[in-house]
Design a protein with these regions (language model features):
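Extended polysaccharide-engagement surfaces of secreted carbohydrate-active enzymes
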Residues: 30, 37-428
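Active-site lining segments of carbohydrate-active enzymes
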Residues: 1-48
């Protein structure tokens, strides 16, 4: 049956270890194992009831595959394992196995598998799954395009032929992140801001990837990624508590610690809707940081507009200790040690370990990466280049009162298209 708290929920979102999106980790393993059982017992007296079988089918077709791009699974559905590159082999193998059964949607699963093989033809498969792949009838198969939102996880996806954008939102129905530390190590300690509006961009050509390219299956997150400045998030920099390491205590039965994680939100307002395009929004009341913000995303074929309003500190006077509230725009690993930003007027070459302030700019375009940011009104933007990773953000100060922002991120666009887009923004 569909879960009421964890597992596959009624909207096909997979939640685990509380209300944490996990379709790309535990959910993928669950789908792979159950698919094998369905295949083995198909057509026998022990066949799985179709009403139960559809739970796995819906998880794969209506949720998990929306978070696949460039051979990896979006980190937003990997729970505490976000620092390891998600490999989509388990998802593909589940689809290939179910396509061999009498499932009513087996043709859809075959088509989905073909789409994955076309999108990432170099994927490694087991011998059995490779045989199933060879046996697929030639036909059309594409990765999903458009917008989807899953309210039980406050998580959404927007897909276009050249890019994927996953995002999370925060409410009293979901938890922020999971940190788990044991004597043998831990994961997830830096996940404070994952639910605070993080817009995770995956380009289908692999550019801008946050993960090392040394292994198809197990690439690790680049060491220079700043987890306090996740794109799309608004946060008080330095305002989150550091999670403690595991310490053995013979008086306690538990052998692990979850630190300061697994906090439910305090706002009831969050949601999203759409099909070809989409819109989503929420009121951010973070677990730590003492501020609030109203945030929304508006998706269209070139990318998305991010809007923020009523960003205000809730800290007592002087209590914030001058830690600034900031909204991060992008964090982009560059293929060039000295990347160039093209501006409306002129250009700026960045140097390693440098931070600069661009005053009142209308837009910038990252040369050779084809990524652009356009502001509705001229904005003062902070730019940092460290470990070949370009980060940009807006600073609202330590005590904001009704601060806001409006910018568009265009993940795959030429310089000429950027200039034309900036000349006719959709807002007045």
């Amino acid at each position: 049956r569909y879960g009421t708290e964890q597992g596959v929920r009624e909207d096909y979102c997979f939640l685990f270890h509380g209300n944490i999106p996990y379709a790309g980790s535990y959910g993928a393993g669950f789908a792979q194992t159950v698919s094998e059982f369905i295949y083995v017992f198909d057509g026998t007296p022990y066949a799985i009831d179709p009403a139960h079988q559809e739970i796995v089918t819906n998880l794969l077709l209506e949720h998990t595959r929306w978070f696949l791009a460039a051979g990896q699974i979006d980190m937003l559905v990997r729970g505490r394992g976000y620092k390891s590159k998600g490999y989509w082999g388990a998802v593909l193998e589940s689809l290939l196995v179910l396509a061999q059964t009498s499932d009513a949607r087996k043709n859809e699963m075959a088509s989905a598998a073909i789409g994955m093989l076309k999108a990432f033809p170099g994927i490694n498969l087991s011998l059995t799954s490779a045989g199933f792949a060879d046996g697929l009838k030639p036909g059309s198969g594409e990765m999903p395009i458009g917008f989807r939102y899953w309210p039980t996880g406050e998580i959404g996806a927007y897909n276009q032929p050249s890019f994927h954008i996953g995002f999370r939102q925060y409410s009293d129905r979901v938890q922020d992140y999971e940190y788990l530390n044991r004597a043998d190590g831990g994961e997830g300690e830096d996940g404070w801001n994952l639910a605070y509006g993080f817009t995770n961009i995956l380009r289908k050509d692999g550019k801008g990837s946050w993960y090392s390219k040394d292994d198809q299956r197990t690439g690790s997150m680049l060491s220079g990624i700043d987890m306090e400045r996740l794109p799309g998030t608004t946060s008080r920099i330095g305002g989150n508590p550091g999670n403690p390491k595991f310490q053995y205590d013979p008086s306690k039965p538990t052998m692990s610690t979850t630190g300061y994680s697994l906090n439910f939100g305090r706002s009831k307002l969050a949601g999203g809707a759409g099909e070809d395009g989409g819109v989503a929004g929420f009121v951010l009341k973070p677990a730590y940081g003492e501020f609030t913000a109203r945030k929304s995303l508006h998706f269209f074929p070139k990318g998305f507009w991010a809007l923020g309003s009523d960003i205000r500190s809730t800290a007592a006077a002087g209590a914030s200790n001058k830690k600034p509230v900031q909204t991060t725009i992008i964090q982009w690993p560059c293929g060039n040690e000295r990347p160039t930003l093209i501006l409306q007027k002129g250009s700026v070459q960045l140097f390693p370990d440098s931070t600069l302030t661009l005053q009142k700019i209308k837009w910038f375009w990252l040369e050779k990466e084809n990524v652009a940011v356009v502001f509705n009104e001229p904005a003062t933007v902070f730019i940092r280049l460290k470990n070949n990773i370009l980060s940009s953000w807006l600073d609202h100060g330590p005590d904001p009162l009704q601060a806001g922002y409006a910018y568009a991120v265009l993940p795959g666009i030429s310089l000429e298209e950027t200039s034309l887009f900036a000349d006719e923004p959709p807002f007045v």
